[in-house]
Amino acid sequence: MILQVQPAKLIKRYKRFLADIELNCGEETTIHCANTGAMKGCAEPDDTVWYTTSTNTKRKYPFSWEITQSQDDHFICVNTLRANQLVEEALHLDLIKELSGFNELKREVKYGNENSRVDFLATYNNAPDTYIEVKSVTLLESGHGYFPDAVTTRGQKHLRELMDMVAQGHKAVLLFAVLHSGINDISAASHVDPIYAKLLKEARLAGVEIIAYKAGFSLQLGELDVKLVEKIPFIER
């Protein structure tokens, strides 16, 4: 995925979906932030914000916060909408070997008993249907990656739905899209959401497959190339 981006300096994030930035010209403006999480370590004052500009002239906030370049020089994709796009791109490029060979890939398919939509449903000729839930990972603490960065009842529901798919004879995958250049392994954040961590352990024992792929970032002349490039370990802590 290639994004046309421009840099700015972060002043502060607030109201979840908004942040104030200082443009290179010195002007201050408000930017849209497509992230409802805590964004711990991803939104410190004076971090560099890389943003895209919408062509929709009716948008109140034409700039979208895509990437944080932290003061210790990590790249972090904070636009959570990009996770599914990156996974879809990687699946079609056959970069996620555990899920290769599908005939069809469908998005946002209704499933389960709790009125959910799975991120992707992959169908195969000689293998079970595969239900894939994608989660974006940006929380780095003490050299390790964690999910979630805030309590997520929605994420808890998705784990129950995935376990139900396994019980019905399907394949179920929880795919962590690791969008922080400093993360090299990932674990459940039991210190953030102990219920989620407990359900994740139950899901793994029930047969839900857990996969984590890390994004690579390349920035040249205002073009930012982001793609999932490396499998990293999921570690139970």
Curated annotation (Swiss-Prot):
This protein's name: Sugar fermentation stimulation protein homolog
Gene3D superfamilies in UniProt: 2.40.50.580, 3.40.1350.60
Signal peptide from the UniProt entry: none
InterPro entries recorded: SfsA, SfsA_C, SfsA_N
Organism, as annotated: Colwellia psychrerythraea (strain 34H / ATCC BAA-681)
UniProt similarity note: Belongs to the SfsA family.
Domain of life of the native organism: Bacteria
A GO MF term: DNA binding
Classification lineage: Bacteria, Pseudomonadati, Pseudomonadota, Gammaproteobacteria, Alteromonadales
